[in-house]
């Protein structure tokens, strides 16, 4: 087939929401359930050709997403409703497409992203939850959210996050730029909201694990700054559980004009 006869290739971006509790993470892997595998299967059915997706952030086992962004290329020309309603009809109930947008050739869900934003939800109550048990992390000791917020502000800006980096992290550098980190209380829920250019492996969960020690008055407010300066993972607290973590937003240059739906999860406003 000559170049003139080649069908046009369309590049499509999707916003994806998922409950990660029954998946072994985002990334497709042999013999285990992954969000990527389910999404690619549904897209391939609608496109009637094999589809491979690329995501903004590969979330770990049990981690959720309300603002994941993916892109894929296809020769299939479909209406937006096919990529949303049609794909959703082929997806399991715990994964959904939130929006669709045709993007230019230079767009890449991961490499075009300028920042990622996560929210970590702690159910801070003496008794464990039942209904939202896989969507929040239960912590029974009373937490001082204002104390946690103050302690966290030392993490702003460009820093070496070795103390909050998983041992198995494959990133070439531990340096990341944190744009904001806020800790707020909403009734029995404590929310840690953090935005950075990128994250090292388990960075949010390791930060939250140590902040909970400060919030429970087991460590002084100055402890987080001391951990950051020490550059030693063994000094920090245990990694917080996956259940409470959500990828809520990914930032891109304005020229791509991607939709920005409410981040959530649940009752949380922007």
Swiss-Prot record:
Entry binding sites for substrate: 118
Alphabetically ordered keywords of this record: Isomerase, tRNA processing
Name the UniProt record assigns to this protein: tRNA pseudouridine synthase A
GO biological process, any: tRNA pseudouridine synthesis
The reaction(s) this protein catalyses: uridine(38/39/40) in tRNA = pseudouridine(38/39/40) in tRNA
EC number: 5.4.99.12
Main function: Formation of pseudouridine at positions 38, 39 and 40 in the anticodon stem and loop of transfer RNAs.
Claim: tRNA processing is one of the keywords in the record: yes
Family: Belongs to the tRNA pseudouridine synthase TruA family.
Domain of life of the source: Bacteria
Active-site residues from the entry: 60 (nucleophile)
Example of a GO MF term: pseudouridine synthase activity
Region RNA binding, annotated ranges: 107-111
The keyword Repeat is assigned to this record: no
Site (Interaction with tRNA): 58, 78, 110, 126, 139
Region annotation Interaction with tRNA: where it falls in the sequence: 168-172
Subunit structure, as described in the record: Homodimer.
């Amino acid at each position: 087939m000559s170049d003139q006869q080649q069908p046009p290739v369309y590049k499509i971006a999707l916003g994806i929401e998922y409950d990660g509790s029954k998946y072994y993470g985002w990334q497709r892997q042999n013999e285990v359930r992954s969000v990527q595998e389910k999404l690619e299967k549904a897209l391939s059915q609608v496109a009637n050709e094999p589809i491979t997706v690329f995501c903004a952030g590969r979330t770990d086992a049990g981690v959720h997403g309300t603002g994941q962004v993916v892109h894929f290329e296809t020769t299939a020309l479909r209406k937006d409703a096919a990529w949303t309603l049609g794909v959703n009809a082929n997806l399991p109930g715990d994964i959904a497409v939130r929006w669709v947008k045709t993007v230019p050739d230079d767009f890449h869900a991961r490499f075009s992203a300028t920042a990622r934003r996560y929210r970590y939800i702690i159910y801070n109550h003496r008794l464990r939850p039942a209904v939202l048990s896989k969507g929040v992390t239960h912590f029974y000791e009373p937490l001082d959210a204002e104390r946690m917020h103050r302690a966290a502000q030392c993490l702003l800006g460009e820093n070496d996050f070795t103390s909050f980096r998983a041992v198995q992290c494959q990133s070439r550098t531990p340096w990341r730029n944190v744009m904001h980190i806020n800790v707020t209380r909403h009734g029995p829920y404590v929310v840690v909201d953090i935005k950075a250019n990128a994250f090292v492996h388990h960075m949010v969960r390791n930060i939250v694990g140590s902040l909970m020690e400060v919030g429970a008055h087991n460590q002084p407010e100055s402890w987080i700054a001391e951990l950051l300066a020490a550059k030693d993972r063994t000094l920090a607290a245990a990694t917080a559980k996956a259940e409470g973590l959500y990828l809520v937003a990914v930032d891109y240059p304005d020229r791509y004009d991607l939709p920005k739906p409410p981040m959530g999860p649940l009752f949380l406003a922007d």
